[in-house]
Amino acid sequence: MNKKELFDAFDGFSQNLMVTLAEIEAMKKQVQSLVEENTILRLENTKLRERLSHLEHETAAKNPSKQRKDHLEGIYDEGFHICNFFYGQRRENDEECMFCRELLDRK
């Protein structure tokens, strides 16, 4: 390999390094932008979770009887008595129980 070919090889290698360095800098900027966006989204997500938790707590505090009624309806729909007379016993053939219905129909 003569001096000119060697110089041309080094020049080509140098140009390739410059192109690669420019690509790395562009990737670095993109990663930095993504990290910033990720941080912003994490903060927003945390705030939204706190807000949701606060709203759920307020809702539960305002209407605990609604949750209890929903829970009792769920048990009844699964085929169990919720009345004082037969509480916890399975309803045969999912027949209606007037005592259970009376509890569910109360306001």
Curated annotation (Swiss-Prot):
Domain of life: Bacteria
Binding site for Zn(2+): 81, 83, 97, 100
Cofactor: Zn(2+)
Statement: the UniProt record of this protein carries the keyword Transmembrane helix: no
GO BP annotations, alphabetical order: DNA replication
Keyword terms, alphabetized: Cytoplasm, DNA replication, DNA replication inhibitor, Metal-binding, Zinc
Subunit structure of this chain's protein: Homotetramer. Interacts with both DnaA and DnaN, acting as a bridge between these two proteins.
Name this polypeptide is given: Replication initiation control protein YabA
Gene that this sequence comes from: yabA
